[in-house]
Amino acid sequence: MKETIGDIDIIAASSDPKELIEAFVKFPGVSQIITQGEAKSTVIYNQKAQIDLEILPENEYGSLLQHFTGSKEHNVTLRTYAQTKNLSFSEHGFKVGGKLKRINNEKDVYGFLKMDWIPPELREDRGEIEAALKHKLPKLVELSEIKGDLHVHSNWSDGQISISDIVRASEKLGYEYVVISDHTVGLGIAHGLNEVELEKRQKEIDTVQKAHPKIKILSSVEVNIKASGDLDIADWMLKKLNIVTASVHTSFFQDRETMTNRIIKAIAHPDVDIIGHPSGRIIGQREPYQVDWPKVFRACAENKTALEISAFPDRLDLMDFLCKDAKTYGVKFAINTDAHQLHHLDLMRFGISVARRGWLGKEDIINTYSLSDLIDWAKR
């Protein structure tokens, strides 16, 4: 699952491609038919998206599926490796001694080359083929392994949901815990809370907790990292909280050294557990900050501070390639939704996708921990 896409490619296996093509071009929302062949068709959907449909016999479906789910770079490297084994590989299958061997199961594409099956998220030519040949691919994190959301905004700040509603929804998701993480006072535009308001919020959390004993409600803030690297709430208040996330919300365009030092100062704060949406990018709107990432990763590893993977679709931050790099330093991660509305809690799957593309497993993600392990980690 990539952050953004261009055209949409759909593949299918059928013994009657003509019937499928007819149904495809008549699908509700198709505003223009670009091409319509016997086994291929291209349409414009809803006057915006181009959708291509290609239909092959069932015995070629596996190789075609691999072709469309691998990036171009991955496929080039895979085909180059096949050539070293005197094989020619295409979306139709393998040519062996001039004869075509068709593949109807995608996993058999990799098995035929005597390598482990490579999950689609890893097919970016970042060393996955070498790892598959050595049987050293990581076991990737699954959505079902998430025990709770560590970054949810309530209507105490700029969220549009009550703490009770957050807790009920989290119970339905099967979570063991949920973290109420409102903005702090320095972010006035988001109705950030001061110390007095945070103590009032805690009373509501305690009341809701009594009504929901099966899930643990943890108290948190998303504290603002000021331009100086200082935090905008008193240390004594931070020490009362279960988890603290620190994020940059202002002064986005500092130079690389200044921004790096600013973030590292927050990482080193003894009460900060997580750095929220670390790069600051908003897809299609704002580029990432200028940051020396190796320095940030080293600081996180030294201070045992986690980096957030924001599952919010316009953020998806930290980006997958940086997750992969950070993992090599021993950095831990928290996959969070940054939910402000109830349906945002369902966005977790997008953060999981980023983590998987970043080669992350369950052991790399702190909100796969049990409640007791998470609390122990936060006390590190």
Where are these regions (language model features)?
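Charged catalytic cores and adjacent phosphate/nucleic-acid-binding surfaces used
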Residues: 3-154, 160-174, 185-215, 227-380
